[in-house]
């Protein structure tokens, strides 16, 4: 009886560990091609063609990579250069 309990506990543990990953994979697969049809000519499928990723924030004038404002002195001469920390690029002001 001890061996049966051990194998049952091992199986249950493995099942619990793998279940969330299997469910997530199944859910992801179902989202790829779902269509709702009212008639043969009218079907709404989603998701539609994937949109390319876009950057929400864009720098005004991108320059060379920088980590401090001093890195932008040569690039922005004679203007003052500021390092945009978000994009790590120089911005001339």
From Swiss-Prot:
Primary localisation category: secreted
Keyword Mitochondrion assigned: no
Disulfide bridge map: 43-83, 66-90, 72-92
One GO term of the biological process aspect: killing of cells of another organism
Signal peptide start and end residues: 1-24
Localisation per UniProt entry: Secreted
Entry's Gene Ontology cellular component terms: extracellular region
Assigned keywords, A-Z: Antimicrobial, Disulfide bond, Fungicide, Plant defense, Secreted, Signal
Protein family per UniProt: Belongs to the DEFL family.
Protein name (database record): Putative defensin-like protein 283
Lineage summary: Eukaryota, Viridiplantae, Streptophyta, Embryophyta, Tracheophyta
